Swiss-Prot record:
It comes from Homo sapiens (Human). This is Large ribosomal subunit protein mL43. Component of the mitochondrial large ribosomal subunit (mt-LSU). Mature mammalian 55S mitochondrial ribosomes consist of a small (28S) and a large (39S) subunit. The 28S small subunit contains a 12S ribosomal RNA (12S mt-rRNA) and 30 different proteins. The 39S large subunit contains a 16S rRNA (16S mt-rRNA), a copy of mitochondrial valine transfer RNA (mt-tRNA(Val)), which plays an integral structural role, and 52 different proteins. It comes from the Eukaryota. High relative levels in skeletal muscle and testis. Lower levels of expression in the heart, brain, placenta, lung, liver, kidney, pancreas, spleen, thymus, prostate, ovary, small intestine, colon and leukocytes. Expression is coregulated with TWNK. Keywords: Mitochondrion, Ribonucleoprotein, Ribosomal protein, Transit peptide. Belongs to the mitochondrion-specific ribosomal protein mL43 family. One of its GO terms (biological process) is mitochondrial translation. It is found in: Mitochondrion. The keyword Transit peptide applies. GO terms for cellular component: mitochondrial inner membrane; mitochondrial large ribosomal subunit; mitochondrial ribosome; mitochondrion. The gene is MRPL43.
């Protein structure tokens, strides 16, 4: 079966467990052992020596021990979400049973299936995953990639735009300095006066503004 056909889920905890206070999901452990069966020797030793210490480390877990004639000893784990896990402890030592019980106590009760990604967020950011260059300037030393390769055309463009822009002079204002312009024929920089509007065209506007203000 392919990966798309197998069940999978995103990495998530039960009801955001651990965000505020951690609640252990294991609710109950039930041991079924035999009093005199050879296959239940390790389970009997675990109940006699280790079960009290496990109960002290996990005060929220209820432990039941059922001593009855059985061929295969087992432990049944019940979780808060209703999941039930049954594990066989047939002919296992005390150390193996302790490791198995601790694994059951650390689980959340969810199905052990394939995790799609090792990280997951319910509210993804438009910036994506954080990396060392997050919120850093995207240009190298303040220059765009085209300016880094050939800065001369960018300067020529700025000079050309400043030379073409018209300037309006009002009466009594000082004359602006001459700006270098680009000759379209020879493609060389020449010193020429910037184009400006005549001051005579502004004279009819000034009395009109004065009349409105005086009225």
């Amino acid at each position: 079966m392919t990966a798309r056909g197998t069940p999978s889920r995103f990495l998530a905890s039960v009801l955001h467990n651990g965000l505020g206070r951690y609640v252990q999901q294991l609710q109950r452990l039930s041991f079924s052992v035999s009093r005199d069966g050879a296959s239940s020797r390790g389970a009997r030793e675990f109940v006699e020596r280790e079960v009290i210490d496990f109960a002290r480390r996990n005060p929220g877990v209820v432990i039941y021990v059922n001593s009855r004639p059985c061929c295969v000893p087992r432990v049944v784990a019940e979780y808060l979400n209703g999941a039930v896990r049954e594990e066989s402890i047939h002919c296992k030592s005390v150390e193996e049973i302790s490791t198995l019980v601790q694994k059951l106590a650390d689980q959340s009760g969810l199905d052990v299936i394939r995790i799609r990604k090792p990280f997951h967020t319910d509210n993804p950011s438009i910036q994506g995953q954080w990396h060392p260059f997050t919120n850093k300037p995207t240009t190298f030393r303040g220059l765009r990639p085209r300016e880094v390769q050939d800065p001369a055309p960018a300067q020529d463009t700025g000079l050309r735009l400043s030379a073409v822009a018209p300037q309006i002079l009002l009466p009594g204002w000082p004359d602006p300095p001459d700006l270098p312009t680009v000759d379209p024929i020879s493609s060389s920089l020449t010193s020429a006066p910037a184009p400006m509007l005549s001051a005579v065209s502004c004279l009819p506007i000034v009395p009109a503004l004065t009349t409105v203000c005086s009225a």
